[in-house]
Regions:
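N-terminal helix-rich structural modules
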Residues: 2-222
Length: 223
């Protein structure tokens, strides 16, 4: 091992960001290098699928966070540092849940400070895209429980939801939308590892992950 190499790049709370070296890559034949490049591009194309599966608001939250950080002029430095800390954890964990514990982490600034930062970012030219067609303050209100309240959707998959609570309804993930365990008693999933189940207009629909189906755009880029 080369003692001059730097492996630990940064620590963010309990998370460590490590650098990995691809020893031997330069010696690979060109066809294997091309394969690795395509796999890398496929991973980038598909990463938003995992974000969306973890929570329905993950992609919109990430967009707002990144727009604030890239349009940060005149935002309070302490608030900006906290938003940066939270965003780094968001990137590391592919969403607002710790990959090891599956529990949600939250921002440590106030709601008012976060809104002020977003409004200032918008003045600086931030465009929040699909997340905020109605204006940043209106759309942020919808995200606030996810950003600040540890008791709202606290865990990705709730295995012990408590008396009277349904496992699916108590889980934060985006695999079952509006569906309870009772709903599934008379419903058979055809693609249980490759679909999302949604209660739609009183009926239950299985949205299959495939070209022409759920995540069409991402899967087309992957394949």
């Amino acid at each position: 091992m080369d003692s001059d190499r730097k492996y630990l790049l940064e620590r963010v709370d309990e998370a460590a960001v490590a650098q990995v070296y691809a020893d031997g890559f330069d010696e690979l034949p060109i066809d294997q290098k091309i394969l690795i490049w395509h796999l890398y591009r496929a991973a980038l194309a598909g990463r938003d699928i995992y974000y969306d599966q973890r929570h329905a608001l993950s992609l919109e939250m990430r967009e707002v966070l990144e727009e604030i950080l890239t349009h940060a002029d005149e935002i309070d430095p302490d608030v900006l540092a906290e938003i940066e800390r939270y965003t780094k954890l968001f990137w590391i964990n592919s969403g607002p849940y710790n990959n090891l514990t599956a529990r949600k982490f939250v921002l440590r600034c106030t709601r008012e400070q976060f809104v002020q930062a977003a409004v200032q970012a918008e003045k600086n030219g931030a465009t929040f895209g699909f997340a905020c067609h109605a204006g940043v303050e209106v759309c942020l209100d919808r995200m606030m429980p996810m950003l600040f309240d540890p008791h709202v959707d606290p865990v990705v998959t709730s295995k012990t939801p408590g008396a009277g609570r349904d496992i699916l309804e108590a889980s934060a993930n985006n695999f079952y939308v509006g569906v309870s365990m009772a709903d599934l008693e008379t419903f058979t999933e055809r693609y249980p590892l490759n679909s999302r189940v949604v209660k739609n207009g009183g009926g239950i629909v299985e949205e299959v992950y495939r070209v022409g189906g759920k995540y069409d755009r991402e899967i087309r880029e992957i394949v």
